[in-house]
């Protein structure tokens, strides 16, 4: 080995590696478990002068700068879950940590890692089948169900009053319905069509939904109108000015009148473009590129409102909101590419001015979030994104399960029944999987301020008597017989993703029995440069 690896390389093998990796996972588990559930505590993330206070799992893991490869694997797993379903990031790290914690007990009993891995995989497959049997199919058009799902998602957030929470829930649902596409009985919610604008100043209760797009730009000329109604809209990806050629040229001018002639030609070129825009009946011109002063003046003179240097993402949203196609050149522009807006006006938001482009048929909308400072508006944005994702998941897979740990406890109960049919030591892994799910429920009760042992024994008893939806009512710190009655529901898609990802991460870590840490490359000494001042 001394001749095989570079000097200074460190190598660990066997159970020592597995147990070390499990220890790392348990540290992450301890860090995140207090943030689990609606009553989970916040974390303060400090980076330089930036401070973030949140209990949002995705934000916490994205801001973690971990060094150990096992920790990195778990963090990447959480990020993947966030990308796939937009929720469950805390849950997946906690559950993976619990699965590894239970696996450690089996390893100490001399159970081989391969047996544990195979048992966990079989338990996962059983869990996914059981989930489908437990879940209830719903209609995505049932607003009450959608309301309850969003309520569950947002109940763990910072909203101060029930009135504020209800207002935000309805805002989220209305925004989702506005951009929802329905084709052949299926639904598609593209969250990218919902723009969130954060404004410092005002109360959170003043947040509002705009049927259209709000752009942080003002008209390019002060003589342009500040408000127009029922107008044609043109979107462009070209500048409104005389463009420079790719070939460098010099003009030889011998007479001052030649300068005037050149400027007149430039004005005539731009005027021709503005005249075409006017002839098409355009009253709002928006481009991703520049608009020169001559064009701005001429458009203002003709009562046309114009915006320049608008972000590509906003241009695409405006296309969805107004129905306008994005013209790539003035030559290709025609009336059939124009869109419509019911109202276009400049408004003040906080200390800045924004342009509101509204339409009754908008397929892209804007949610304006107001709050006293950046921390509040940033956390609100994260909360709304979670809510939008919960609706998207429900549309993709219209099944729900009871929340508050009810589904995890029911799975644990049924897995133990299935474990009796498993032959050999894999039965122990089956039961360990069930124990991890129950431990998850125990943590949920603990973050709600309950005694975890008492809570677990009570919820276990209720499920044993057939109350499959019994769970933890965190608002009153009690075990309730039917969480569906309390409007506490979760999306089946999120639960499936959390189970899959947590199990995959745990089994991947259990498969590692050799870790080789290469020694850092030795830096070659730099040759000393002669001092020119010495002889």
Swiss-Prot record:
Would the keyword Nucleotide-binding be found if you checked this record's keyword annotation? yes
The record's annotation in SUPFAM superfamilies points to:
GroEL apical domain-like, GroEL equatorial domain-like, GroEL-intermediate domain like
| UniProt keyword annotations, A-Z | ATP-binding, Chaperone, Nucleotide-binding
Instruction: Name any one GO molecular function.
Output: unfolded protein binding
Task: Give the matching InterPro entries.
Answer: Chaperone_TCP-1, Chaperonin_TCP-1_CS, Cpn60/GroEL/TCP-1, GroEL-like_apical_dom_sf, GROEL-like_equatorial_sf, TCP-1-like_intermed_sf, TCP-1_chaperonin, thermosome_alpha
Gene Ontology BP terms = protein folding
Cite the PANTHER family for this sequence.
CHAPERONIN
Function recorded in the entry: Molecular chaperone; binds unfolded polypeptides in vitro, and has a weak ATPase activity.
Which family would the database say this protein is a member of? Belongs to the TCP-1 chaperonin family.
Q: What's the subunit arrangement here?
A: Forms a Heterooligomeric complex of two stacked eight-membered rings.
Name of the protein in its database record: Thermosome subunit gamma
- Supply the source organism's classification: Archaea, Thermoproteota, Thermoprotei, Sulfolobales, Sulfolobaceae
Q: Could you tell me the gene encoding this protein? A: thsC
